[in-house]
Amino acid sequence: MQSSQLRRLLYYKAFGYRYVSAEILSGGERFFKALDALKSATAECNLCELAKTRAGSGEQNFKNFKTIKNFKNSKTPANVKLMIVALAPGANDGFGGSLEAEIEAALDQICAPEEIYFSFLIRCAVPQNRRVSSEMILKCAPYLTDEIKILKPKVVLCLGELCCKIVLRNGDLAGIDALHGSVFNEGGISFVPSFDPAFIAQNPSKAELFKEDLQKIKELL
């Protein structure tokens, strides 16, 4: 089985599928050797239904959201130590939503802003009345996979249970309450799951656990 087919199969498994036809797995290999090429492809992406609802090009839509630190000006650090990945950008909130300032302050304690890179599993905002679908994940996740390969960060912080399971390609992992703070090593990169900011906003007691996860990341850096 080709690597691209295996990757797709693992994504479907993470979604809970037990059977996937060969036709579904027949999508072509997509591999970007440079970040500029990946961003250009993202800007013109029409692979899923979200392309019909976004305003402007995909990459511009990706840049327009209010986010913290270097992601606001969309500059890519020359030496990425920490890559932070959330499920999808919010149409109105920033990367950290109402907790943006608090997350920013916590990150200041573990890593220099110019060494942090922010990204999303799904590049376009998902309308509030629409659930994340397997199609969105399958079409968009390869962009992130290649982005990680290009940037080669020391640590990838995955925010939220679904995002963690897709990035780690393992739907059998425990829930985020048990999963957070664990360290998974692959290809010389440490992957650390933690809570999504929106989840923390609804469950304030998780904020301290999130900060503890960040301290664990500091040790890995």
Identify the role of each PLM range.
Residues 2-221:
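A polyanion-binding, active-site-adjacent surface
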